Swiss-Prot record:
UniProt protein name: Photosystem II reaction center protein Psb30
Species per Swiss-Prot/TrEMBL record: Welwitschia mirabilis (Tree tumbo)
Keyword annotations from UniProtKB, A to Z: Chloroplast, Membrane, Photosynthesis, Photosystem II, Plastid, Thylakoid, Transmembrane, Transmembrane helix
A Pfam match: PSII_Ycf12
InterPro entries registered for this protein in UniProt: PSII_Ycf12_core-subunit (IPR010284)
Location(s), subcellular: Plastid, Chloroplast thylakoid membrane
Function: A core subunit of photosystem II (PSII), probably helps stabilize the reaction center.
Length: 33
């Protein structure tokens, strides 16, 4: 595979995984849970 394709897939995977975690972390800090 092309290195650029692998890099894009990696960034997309990281974004999908860290997105909900960041929102969850911010919710905890704000005490909205």
């Amino acid at each position: 595979m092309n290195i650029e394709v692998i890099a894009q897939l990696t960034m997309l995977t990281i974004a999908v995984i860290t997105g909900p975690l960041v929102i969850f972390f911010l919710a905890i800090r704000k005490g909205n849970l």
